[in-house]
Amino acid sequence: MAKKGGWAAFPHDNAAFVYDGAALKKNWARLHKGDAEPFPSGDSAKAIEQAWRLYHAGDFEGAYEAGIKAGLDGYNVANKAACIYNNYLETSDANKQTAYAAVAARCEELQAAQQKNANAYYLAAYALGRYGQLIGVAKALAQGIGGKVSKALETALKLEPKHADAHIAFGTFNAEVIEKVGSMIGKMTYGVSKEAAVENYDKALKLNPESAVARTEMADGLYKLFGDKKMKDVEALYAEAAAFEPKDAMECLDVAAAKAEME
């Protein structure tokens, strides 16, 4: 896999993911059905549009750099590019931890400046959640990361109730905490439940029915919560995810991951 500036190149054909000119706005609603990100506006709109074009085409490093260069308004695209790249393409756990910590720090800065920016909270939760998975859920909970993730997701959903990706993340948060500490302690200490996990996954699928990652995350969550009793549902969700036609680089990575899991 070729490297550019330390970031691995996108490993798939991206010809179908190029949204030049007006194509970006025309396809925006479909491309952002998961994160409910508004189309760029303001003085830096053109630069941020270009950053999103790079992101959707799989140039995560280019998108990150362009987003950072655009200032606070570009932080969402920069942070999402960093999150997706590190989740799927970065191979070093140490690099991942550093990147997720940096995303969380930028999100705090953005939250202070733009208190109604839902993705400033969602991406903080995503980064902290992935960071917690890397260091271990038990250790993350002991460090108070669980509470930060929960609060960030609650805020994101309060600001944008139709944020499908935040519902996915909340479902996974509930499932992982219960898997680690059990239903009773999970509910008493962190306010999580199996019912809340399933409810959030279901909401995500209703809001974004063409989402592959909603299905794979739900499949993983169901297995964490119910084990082999839900294996038929788990397998069906993975099969559905693997059959999707991706519309951008992130979705391509989601579908590829689903296919790999089924092999």
Per-segment meaning from a language model:
Residues 69, 118, 164, 203, ...:
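Secondary-structure boundary/capping motif
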Residues 155, 159-209:
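Alpha-helical adaptor scaffolds
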